[in-house]
């Protein structure tokens, strides 16, 4: 009798464990898609206007937490609800912004003080400019470690880890 009880407990434990483990087989990490746009979540966008309110929730009746005042500022969308996008900036601050205030044109923010812009994507390449911290530059293209940006009439390559607004593994032609 004691042996049957132990066997039945082990059997139940195995069944329970298989219910938890079986769904994990064949699971592949696919990019999450926005419920409204079907575009990747998260993704980077930019501020289309000179001033935009970031609200606590996705409607005009929600309190304004932040006012963004830099046109072309890169923002990361990490949620969608109807005509609203939940965004965060390079400091991790944000809120809900109406989609009409955002653009798919990509910009990046310079993280490092006087980031060296180079002629080619190599640490040995000629420095053609030094871009000040917090400048906003147009994102042109990216390879594994470098991105080509356009800033103040200069077009050159900067290390990917010196900018905000592009993902570590992102490639852009």
PLM features: residue spans?
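Bacterial N-terminal signal peptides
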Residues: 11-23
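Bacterial N-terminal signal peptides that target proteins for export
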Residues: 1-14
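Beta-strand-rich domains and repeat architectures in extracellular enzymes and scaffolds
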Residues: 63-64
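SH3-family beta-barrel domains
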Residues: 28-56, 67-71, 78-81, 85-93, ...
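Glycine-centered signal
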Residues: 5, 25-26
